[in-house]
Amino acid sequence: MQIGPYTFPGRFFLAPLAGVSDRPFRAICREMGAAFAYTEMVSAHGLAHGTEQTESYLDRDPEEVPFAVQIFAAEPEVLARGAAAAVAAGAGLVDINMACPVKKVCGSGAGAALARDPLAVERAVRMVAAAGGVPVTVKIRSGWDDGSVNCVEVARAAEAGGASAVALHGRTRAQGYAGRASWEQVRAVKEAVRVAVLGSGDVWTSADALRMRRETGCDAVLVARGACGNPWIFRELRAAERGEPTPPPPSRDEWADVVLRHVRMQVDHRRRQPRWRDDPAEAERHAIRELRKHLLWYTRGRRGGVHFRREAGTVATAEDVARLVERHFPGGGRGFEIDPALAAAEEIRE
């Protein structure tokens, strides 16, 4: 699998997830077998102006090569300046977000709103490619709504502008994350362009990811919500790519090790930020607040998870989390396996 000059060891990537795909989570997913991982969405305006909060999104592991930064803005000129700033900070690949359905983002003309105008898409890609000097990818949706499905036209415009790959989430902006993703549209985009196509949408399990590849012919699959609380999905996919047996689900001890390592990594990540270097205790509290959603996801479908989640909103330190894990999921405890019925009832909707 290749994008520009970069060859990847597999075809299953961690998608750019706002508020999720930070350095610690990317590291865990890569450790499990993700062939590649994007950052979460970063404001091109903030990058261009060097704001402290925006720069915190650029924290990365040295082995992240290429370091791929996803940017968003409404104006091609701002996207270009943001891309140049990202490259100056170490990015080796830039992705333009043209898929975010959030009202605030679309209301500014960014995200999915930008993809309503294929000519603007082509211009934006061309300017970002020229400014950054690195491969450019774009993430798009099927269209704005059912009456304006334009993903093939937009993908062709991105290709004409110089994009090295196009990622398609097979839902419209109007759908948000509801309903069913159209894998047929992923296949249509794959058949319409020569550049690499990445499929996204309704990839909850390793079986889903493998089926998307078979049914659409896409070059790679972006795993998004399916990785939340389950980075082991990438271990299963790596085994499948190698023709190896499916590995067993994580044991309780392995699960707890990953959860608590994630906690420690998140705390370290925040303590590296300039605003918290002189206040490690506040950095830890902030990190734990950020991690609460991950704690909910890690326990989704597990017996005991309901009681764990009721208390997770009160934790403030890494030690609090460790005690909570031991109390509700004690070592050697039985019934740790995921209950499919519980998992379905607690499906991630956001």
Language-model segments: residues:
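N-terminal small/glycine-rich loop or linker at the start of catalytic domains
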Residues: 1-12, 45-68, 100, 105-108, ...
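Glycine-rich, positively charged N-terminal anion/phosphate-binding segment
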Residues: 2, 17-92
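Alpha/beta catalytic cores of nucleotide-metabolism and tRNA/nucleoside-modifying enzymes
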Residues: 4, 8, 12-13, 18, ...
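Active-site beta-loop-alpha junctions enriched in small/polar residues
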Residues: 17-19, 42-44, 72-74, 99-101, ...
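Alpha/beta enzyme core
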Residues: 31, 80-110, 118-197
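Conserved beta-strand positions in the central sheet of alpha/beta enzyme cores
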Residues: 38, 68-70, 95, 137, ...
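Aromatic- and acidic-residue-enriched carbohydrate-binding clefts of CAZyme catalytic domains
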Residues: 115
